[in-house]
Structures are given as structure tokens and as C-alpha cells.
């Protein structure tokens, strides 16, 4: 509504990749100029530890005692296949790197998505801080080119590697608002309906 504001949305893996997945996909597809940061702890922490869309297939909880028996959602692959023009991943324990990736997402012209590994110390004893510290690979220390979409696809579909850093960024991204010529500040539109619209209301009521 106000093109002068930076729009940031924060959520979790439970809502973002489940009931809110449709909003995520279409915001990415349209390339809306906003940043979306998801705290991914691979569990529903606030509702006492049920499996989330990113929980491991064999992850046992009170509601899935035999595991989920479902392939977990791959957030980076979902974002990439939906058309996101900036995709990053960070670890909540590495504040400096996290802040840098989020800054780049905010500065990006278009939809900036950051998935954040945020271990739940209460209900998830598998995907722990120690697990991520041992498993994470900083993609910036590899030969990865974040502007190469095919390379990004290859990285996000690799099994067993937990990458952090900027996975993909389209240098030619044109945000939805610019592409569609949306320039007006809706906050400056006068209140109230036009008089001709009110005439229609009076005619039927």
C-alpha cells in the first residue's frame, strides 16, 4: 500500500510450509518486493511438539509415534520452483552471517526468502544446535555461483548437505510493483467512496 516502506514478514516452518504455503508460493511467483524470513525448527514448537512439514520422515512425536512417513518439504526447492528471485539460508546461532544474508534479502529488488535453521531445544532432540554446527556448509566457501539458477537447483536438491548463505539471486529481477506500474501510495487516497458509487448503493437499498 505504501511503496516507500520495506515489507518484512516473519513466520515458522509450521505455518509457512503448511497452511500458509499458498501465500508463500504466490508471493514468490509474483516476485512481490518483500522479504520473508522463516524460522525453521522442523517441529510445531508452540503446540507442544507435533511434526511439521520439514520434520524428518522417521521423526517420532506424540502424534506420529512411528514417524511421519512423509518426505519433508524442502523449503529452498519450494522457493526456487515457485520463482523466488532471492533465496538464502542461515543458522540462528551464527548471528553475523544471518544478519548479512537478511540484509541482502531486504536490499534485493523482488521477493527475498530466507530459511533460518532455528533449533527447538524443548521438543526436537534430533535437529539440535550441535547437529547443525557439525552439518552446515557455508556455500560461500564453495565454487557456487548464486546467479546460476541451474547450479542452485543442483545444490538445493542435494541430499544430506545443510547449506547456508545466498543460494540464489537473480541479478535481473524486476519486482511485481515495477513490472505492473504500481506507483501510487494508497495511504494518500482520500477516504470514502466516490459519489457515483454511493448512488448505486442508494438505488439498491
Tell where the protein language model's regions lie, with residue ranges.
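Short acidic/glycine-rich loop or secondary-structure boundary segments that cap or lie
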Residues: 45, 96-98, 114, 121-126, ...
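Short catalytic-loop micro-motif centered on adjacent basic/acidic residues
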Residues: 9-11, 86-91, 113
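Short hydrophobic alpha-helical runs that function as membrane-insertion/retention elements
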Residues: 35-38, 88, 115
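Conserved thiamine diphosphate
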Residues: 4, 52-105
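Thiamine diphosphate
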Residues: 1-45, 100
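Flexible, low-complexity linker and terminal segments
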Residues: 120-205
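Short, surface-exposed, charged loop/turn segments at secondary-structure junctions
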Residues: 50-57, 95, 102-111, 125-138, ...
